Amino acid sequence: MVAETIAKYGRLDVLVYNSGAIWWASVAKSPMKRFQLMQRVNVEGLYGVVQACLPHFEQSDGTWRGRIIIVSPPIYSRFFRGKTAYAMGKVGMSVLTKGLAMDFQREGKSEMAVTSIWPATAVQSAATQNMAQEDAKDLRTANVFSDAVLQMIKAPVEEVNGELLLDEDFLRMKGVSDFEKYNLVEGSRPRRIMPAVFPDLRVKEQDDEGRRVDSTKLGASRL
């Protein structure tokens, strides 16, 4: 897929990872095959695509330039409830956003940004197609999501790199105030499903790395 993109367009500017597998149930009711599928699609799939794309963000002059958008949530404990197996993968995707952003900063790649996006309300998609008809009033169209993605791609690196953002909140920050146009059912008021405030994942010792270890310099890997 990446090779075909480069062959056709000669460059890569943006990666949006929107693939996903979903299974919401307790641990006892989440069989291993479901768990493994979600990890392969959500976590391994993301990691593999990012690894394949990264070299193509390097420019001919040695600088790096590009944007990566990942569909994964802010990290908070309520998200784990009733869907632990699913949450393990989606939160892992958000960890990649945080960690890769740190890589960009440490390596001086000041024109690279990776950002996670998640819906503030339920959005019309394959994941919501089985909702009861009377619940359609709580859905927004996918346009709210795509509009937010476009704004993230255009935003300054320092504004979005390493951020775990909600579509509505980011659009409001960018000056959007009319959200009725996104409602699936005219005149409805979709219920917000995400918290208003999220925990700060940083610690006082955030910049203290201790003795930094680079496994690539410790000899040949046994894998």
Locate predicted features.
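Hydrophobic positions on the long internal alpha-helix
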Residues: M1, V16, G48-C53, F57, ...
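Catalytic loop of short-chain dehydrogenase/reductase
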Residues: E58-G108, W118-V123, Q129
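Rossmann-fold scaffold of SDR-type NAD(P)-dependent oxidoreductases
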Residues: L12-G20, N42, I70, T115-S116
